[in-house]
Amino acid sequence: MFRLWLLLAGLCGLLASRPGFQNSLLQIVIPEKIQTNTNDSSEIEYEQISYIIPIDEKLYTVHLKQRYFLADNFMIYLYNQGSMNTYSSDIQTQCYYQGNIEGYPDSMVTLSTCSGLRGILQFENVSYGIEPLESAVEFQHVLYKLKNEDNDIAIFIDRSLKEQPMDDNIFISEKSEPAVPDLFPLYLEMHIVVDKTLYDYWGSDSMIVTNKVIEIVGLANSMFTQFKVTIVLSSLELWSDENKISTVGEADELLQKFLEWKQSYLNLRPHDIAYLLIYMDYPRYLGAVFPGTMCITRYSAGVALYPKEITLEAFAVIVTQMLALSLGISYDDPKKCQCSESTCIMNPEVVQSNGVKTFSSCSLRSFQNFISNVGVKCLQNKPQMQKKSPKPVCGNGRLEGNEICDCGTEAQCGPASCCDFRTCVLKDGAKCYKGLCCKDCQILQSGVECRPKAHPECDIAENCNGTSPECGPDITLINGLSCKNNKFICYDGDCHDLDARCESVFGKGSRNAPFACYEEIQSQSDRFGNCGRDRNNKYVFCGWRNLICGRLVCTYPTRKPFHQENGDVIYAFVRDSVCITVDYKLPRTVPDPLAVKNGSQCDIGRVCVNRECVESRIIKASAHVCSQQCSGHGVCDSRNKCHCSPGYKPPNCQIRSKGFSIFPEEDMGSIMERASGKTENTWLLGFLIALPILIVTTAIVLARKQLKKWFAKEEEFPSSESKSEGSTQTYASQSSSEGSTQTYASQTRSESSSQADTSKSKSEDSAEAYTSRSKSQDSTQTQSSSN
């Protein structure tokens, strides 16, 4: 007979209507990676790594060691319209790490490095979450403090499967136990199922859901480390379209249903225990499991309910407690059981606490008793969890192990190679064997250009530093600087002009299509018009505001059909425009050549960023604010650091340096001109104001001289008169509903003119008229001239 234990949610705690778990103290940080591969005998690259992570303006060094808890044959089972699909090749199994924080021996860190850093940093009594900042240009991450304000979150209750009384107690004390053997490594293989509601709650994205499950398993592993138990995630099943069993009822009822389904459908999938994760807003129980039944196939299962307003850290504790129950570990008596940390894992109040958690001595004795008396043979087989690279082979063209170079076979290397094909080390006298700054086996001198500008207005040419054969990182000017006569902005080192791009793809005369064409093609959300694919390989609709930020649509200027090898062409006749786009039939892993690039103009004052049409003023303002630190003698680059004008040097371009120049002088002039448009306008305005004043002043001086001469002559010729030529200029503009007419006339006469002069121009007078008339469907322009 077995007893069913349930994890009961406290009414005044986790399931209260107010949020209980909160993420606070949001920080944007840039972790700095430190290479520390100290294990030279290991065949696994980057087995040990370290990061410097700023928290609250203080730097912490995190030391990590690679952990393997994903099986090499790890599979994801996903459902789409009733049919099941499997995925495995896209899952990375060697980017999960655990470790601690330097100077804090009781700390615990669990991180994934697959795509940025994602995981939890736990100090003694406080925890921080970290994850990559989406759409960030640099290695920026969001760091936040995990905070829980609830009390009495959860307690365990038990239900007997039969109505017979049971002797055992839910709590155990630290009494003397019989001698048990030392612990030895055990491997618990899990098959986890995520129901439809939790799949949707986590975003309906298979990759996001997978990462969350992996993070939960990683946190559980960090807690089971002291027992030498590795929780191996052997497979993951996502009920993405519908639940395969009813999820209505209490946790114990759901467990019975899940066991029946498990026995029918999971026989061929290797696992020691199967778990069903279900989302419920406010469940009465948080889980159900049969204690002490780990290696009994009929009962090796559990159901864990994910309630509203809970963190992954807290849910990982719930899963850990349930796994511990299956391994015969009882719930602690807080009065009698102690652990090295402030809160023990099997403590009734552990879910409401933050920071590092460990098993108590009571849990250790209970676990030792279980493996000694009951046995855990099913956990003794070690699954393959790391794909070890083969031993280095010199001459295969791949850099492996301790090889300095590997150019391939003797024929492939050739006599001019800098690498010895026999030993895979550099030849005598050689300083390098490849790289943009390596020529004739020698490192090029400092200042030699190794990477020219990709765009003359938005990129920076990189030079060799004289010590490395590599060219160094590709640095561009900061996003937001104006380019192409202030029509566009620089973004990622380029000035994206959709008209020019259309012309390069579809030929001369092609232009970016009007919005109506984008609306016609992009609204279909198919292979011709979309904003990419989601994790389920479905096309994403752009949304009305973002239609131009999906795939490029152009006008087609000729009647000759456009031919694209290995591509399908679609035309759309919208109003008076012929629109065109192409699907290149490329693999999903290859970027779409017609995807609209970041920084492309999508509306007046707006540009595309990550397939969203956003205001460009924010990007421009960011560039302006950054460049203010350059003291007016430089602009910012993509690292938010100053590149200085000739004669000034970093970091703030304040100090003069004779002969120092980051940019060529002619380039820096144009850059500064674009970066300081306000300065240019100020000079122009000053010039326009000063010019009339100068003219008037000159005229007054000349007039005074002329008057002196006139009075002098008047004494001699009192009856003489002086006449001057006069001129009249008129500009007239007249508009109506049908069109507009603009006329400019100029008259010059040999005789003096006055305000009362009413004479009209004759044959010697000239007039020019320009007439423009436009209608809804056509336009006519006429220019006439008469003499």
Curated annotation (Swiss-Prot):
GO biological process: binding of sperm to zona pellucida; cell adhesion; male gonad development; proteolysis
TM regions (residue ranges): 683-703
Signal peptide: 1-16
Lipoprotein as UniProt keyword: no
Molecular function terms, GO-annotated: metalloendopeptidase activity
Gene3D superfamilies (UniProt xref): Collagenase (Catalytic Domain) (3.40.390.10), Disintegrin domain (4.10.70.10), Galactose-binding domain-like (2.60.120.260)
Extracellular side: 175-682
Domain EGF-like: 622-654
Topological domain spans for side Cytoplasmic: 704-787
Subcellular location: Membrane
Stored CDD domains: ZnMc_adamalysin_II_like (cd04269)
Cystine crosslinks: 295-378, 337-362, 339-344, 450-471, 626-636, 630-642, 644-653
Region span, Disordered: 715-787
SMART domains, per the entry: ACR (SM00608), DISIN (SM00050)
The Peptidase M12B domain, residue ranges: 186-383
Domain Disintegrin: 391-479
Origin: domain of life: Eukaryota
Protein name per UniProt: Disintegrin and metalloproteinase domain-containing protein 32
Organism from which the protein derives: Homo sapiens
Gene behind the chain: ADAM32
